[in-house]
Amino acid sequence: MPQQKKEVLVFDLNKTFYNKSSKDEFFKFVVSKKPRQAKYYLQMLYYELLLMMHQIRKTEFKENFFNYLDNLPPSQVEAYAKEFWENEFPQNFNKELLNRFKVARDNGTELFCATGGLEVYVKPLFNLFPISGFAGTQAEYVNGTYKVMGKACKDEEKTRRISKHYGNFGFTIAEAYSDSKEDILEEAEKAFLVEDGEIKPYPKNSKT
């Protein structure tokens, strides 16, 4: 008898489930612990400008934006992230989405977060809100800095990572939520765009 496909609800993190941008908020938190890391602020603005001008790839942006984590080993970043998310969850998360996700999970739908954030600081969140799967931008700590492994977890890379997670089991994206018009919304049976906390049905083939 063939295995039944997993029914999956996929969601983005930043400005979708989490009301803010975790990369910016986590920087503020790290600076509160290590004030010297504030020296990276102007550098971060520079790389954001390059990204907006399409002068830098998303993977290269991720690797350079997170230079503020330099000389902080994974164990330290994870400890900071644990405290950070304990301060943020659940009060700074989209309450309607939180309720939707809980209902879906109780009904047997698997929850999967696919985000461009670095896994090293995002992962501790899901000790507070358990889900079935998670994919973020992977990085390794080499000589005091974080180097992105492969591609940033954006666009088609999200789909690839979800497929890798489920392997031979097969899956159907029953619902997808994001704050941007991305590939994953086109692939879902039901897709929703989150704009300033408001959840709106996403019309297919509207990605520009």
Task: Locate predicted features.
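Active-site neighborhood of HAD-like aspartate-dependent phosphohydrolases
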Residues: 1-53
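C-terminal cap/substrate-recognition subdomain and adjoining C-terminal extension
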Residues: 2, 6, 79, 86-208
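Residues within well-ordered alpha-helical secondary structure of globular protein domains
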Residues: 29-32, 83, 190
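Conserved alpha/beta cores of soluble small-molecule-handling proteins
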Residues: 35-36, 47, 56, 74-76, ...
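Short, compositionally biased "basic patch" segments
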Residues: 48-53, 59-74, 129, 134
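Metal-dependent phosphoesterase signature
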Residues: 60-96
